[in-house]
Amino acid sequence: MKMLILIGPEGREADLRELVARHSVHAYSEFRNVTGEGETGRHLGTSVFPGRSVVIFTVVPAGRLADLKAALAEFRKGLYAEEGVRAFVLPVEEML
C-alpha cells in the first residue's frame, strides 16, 4: 500500500478529486485553506501573498500507483504555470 499526497491550488480540488475517482479511489481525506511556500511562490492567503492550497491524501494499492502518476502528469499539462500541483508517495506499513 502507498499513501498518495496531492497538493494543488485552491479551486482545483474538484479536479483532483475527479482524477483519483477515475482510478477507483473513493476514500480520501482533504485539507483546505492550506498555506505555504514552494516552487510557485508563497501562498499565504493574504493580499501580499494571495492564494491557498488544498491537500488530498489517500492510500492505494501499490499496483494502482503507476496509472495515477500517469494521470497526474497528464493533468499537470493543462495547468497554468502558477498552478503547481505536487504529488508525494509514502510507504504505508500498516492500516489499523
Language-model segments: residues:
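Positively charged, small/polar-rich N-terminal and surface patches that mediate targeting and assembly
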Residues: 1-96
